[in-house]
Amino acid sequence: LQAVPVIIEDNVFIGSRCIVVEGVKVCKEAVLGANVVLTASTKIIDVTGENPIEYKGVVPSRSVVIPGSYTKSFSAGDYQVPCALIIGERKESTDKKTSLNDALREYKVSA
């Protein structure tokens, strides 16, 4: 049994090959770019401001998210660990791209 469900709010766009597992909430109108992997323990780092803001288990509303990595030190050395990066906020141009995908699905057109 899942301790905490996956919650995907309204008008979220999920790109190809994304993985979202238990304990993650994706808030309304967020955009997950291709290959984003989110677990309850995945660092979600907002890099849009002067200083990074770190989230775990939640993608804020209207965030545009892509896969990324950060450096973590281990006994054997420094290695890159996967994370998700918030690189911006959903804009009108993003809405147009996602509405095109909706239209293609509605009319069963493969692209």
Protein language model features and the residues they cover:
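Structural signal for interior beta-strand "rungs" in well-ordered beta-sheet cores
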Residues: L1-S73
